[in-house]
UniProtKB/Swiss-Prot annotation:
Stretches of the chain found on the membrane's Virion surface side: 22-120
The protein's name: Glycoprotein 4
GO CC terms in record: extracellular region; host cell endoplasmic reticulum membrane; host cell Golgi membrane; membrane; viral envelope; virion membrane
Keyword Repeat tagged: no
Entry's family note: Belongs to the arteriviridae GP4 protein family.
Function field: Minor envelope protein. Part of the glycoproteins heterotrimer GP2b-GP3-GP4 which is probably responsible for the attachment to target host cell. This attachment induces virion internalization predominantly through clathrin-dependent endocytosis.
Length: 152
């Protein structure tokens, strides 16, 4: 029973990151590429570079699309959400990933081109780690842990 638990654990912790990176390609963002166009309230569209507009409300949904080769890394998007939360502490931001689509609904616009000198946005200067690198490190750590439990 212990062996079956080890095998299923290995399959789980190796398979999930591989499937995740298959459907969501792991690419780092160009964090200094700030160009974006907003088309009205509730709809934000731009080129396939770094998204530098975030629209949030007190109960907003943020849809990210990390499927394109030049799309921002998920870690970078989380930094954007964190910066928006620090800028607007009363807003509740719901983050959701979907395979094909990038849509932000809201009435509070965070323009990084104008506000990137704000101290909260200095977080964005940090390099965005690709999801694949994080997944590989996580899988290696879990493999070591499972090996210790199974064979030591």
């Amino acid at each position: 029973m212990k062996i079956y638990g080890c095998i299923s654990g290995l399959l789980l912790f190796v398979g999930l990151p591989c499937c995740w990176c298959t459907f969501y390609p792991c690419h780092a963002a160009e964090a200094r590429n700030f160009t974006y166009i907003s088309h009205g309230l509730g709809h934000v569209h731009g080129h396939e570079g770094c998204r530098n507009f975030i629209n949030v409300t007190h109960s907003a949904f943020l849809y990210l699309n990390p499927t394109t080769p030049t799309a921002p890394a998920i870690t970078h998007c989380l930094l954007l959400v964190l910066a928006a939360k620090m800028e607007h502490p009363n807003a509740t931001i719901w983050l959701q990933l979907q395979p094909f689509g990038y849509h932000v609904a809201g009435d509070v616009i965070v323009n990084l081109e104008e506000d990137k000198r704000h101290p909260y946005f200095k977080l964005l200067r940090a390099p965005a780690l690709p999801l694949g690198f994080v997944a590989i490190v996580y899988v290696l750590l879990r493999l070591v842990r499972w090996a210790q439990r199974c064979y030591l």
